[in-house]
Amino acid sequence: MLQYLIILLDDASTSYCHYNQSQSQHQLIGLADLKAGIRFAMKENLMIQYVYPDCDLPQEYKETIETIDHSKIIPSNSPLVEEADIVVFNDWKDTVGFSFDESATYVLRICKEDLFAQKEVIGTFISKVARLNIVLTDVETFTENDFSKYKSVLDSFGKETEKQYKAGMSPQLNVITDRIALSQMNNCNAGSNNITLAPDGRFYICPAFYYSAEDKETFCVGDLQSGLAIKAANLYKLAYAPLCRICDAYQCKRCVWINRKMTFDITTPSHEQCVLAHLERNTSRSVLESMRKDKEFYPEQDIKEINYLDPFEVKIDWHKI
């Protein structure tokens, strides 16, 4: 069931997830399409998330945006960043000298090499913000050696998270704390509980499909005049993902864009995505167990010990997962 409408305000709207957005030329969504998108959201009872470019907007757009409840996703280098509900850093260097708000949510989009090299710096952000989401921009390039490095990064973040917990704080770091708190899958769910309206006035499963180098006609799933027309819509639902629906890496993005890119099947996750999610899961388990040595901590939560990182490794015993 759809819950959110993501509206890209400009062709150069920031990425906030795994996909890369290389469009530099600004082309605003038509004002009529913006208003029609808002009417669509009202009719379907959807919450709107506006995704901003790095430039200012005309006053009439600002006024239209405020006609409905919404949240704003804005890049850190935008002149409107103080209005953001979610601030996006597209480079870790953009955090240097940035004035963090302890009550705000931040997304750090980062490649693996920068993450490995800057883990100590990034770890200091955990105590400065209400929530930090770390999003890898090159998941498909991870090797076995990279997985080992990522585990080391997670261990470092896990120690910092424990430190904050023990100081009486409530840190939120997506790759560590989400799995500790979750009791069921909490994925991206593009195509099932959210859909994207692009600047061309058409709908796409998520922004990644709009920004794909492939023909946009391939990925368009409707428009403002005709409504949504998602082919095989059930395939975007968790219930139709045979491996993911029995997995307990509940914090996994289950990114259908990466699935399609890596396995040519939106229901089948890649080895890289699975291993990264299970490394995060296991670190969450370690933090949970460590905290329980000192006090009661999420007593209702039970993250079982496992001996695999990719469910395909135990495919014969899927019923044991």
Map each language-model feature to its residues:
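Conserved beta-strand positions
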Residues: Y50-Y52, I134, L197
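Flexible mid-to-C-terminal extensions adjoining Fe-S/redox cofactors in radical SAM and related proteins
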Residues: Y210-I321
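Extracellular/mature segments of secreted proteins
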Residues: I6, Q25-L31, A198, E214, ...
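A C-terminal junction/extension of Radical SAM enzymes
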Residues: R131, E140-A213
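Conserved AdoMet/S-adenosylmethionine-binding subsite of the radical SAM
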Residues: Q59-E160
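Conserved alpha-helical substructure of the radical SAM core
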Residues: M1-E83
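Class I S-adenosyl-L-methionine
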Residues: I6-C17, K93, K112, Q172, ...
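Active-site pocket-lining/capping segments in soluble small-molecule metabolic enzymes
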Residues: S13-Y16, S76-V81, L108-I110, N187-G191, ...
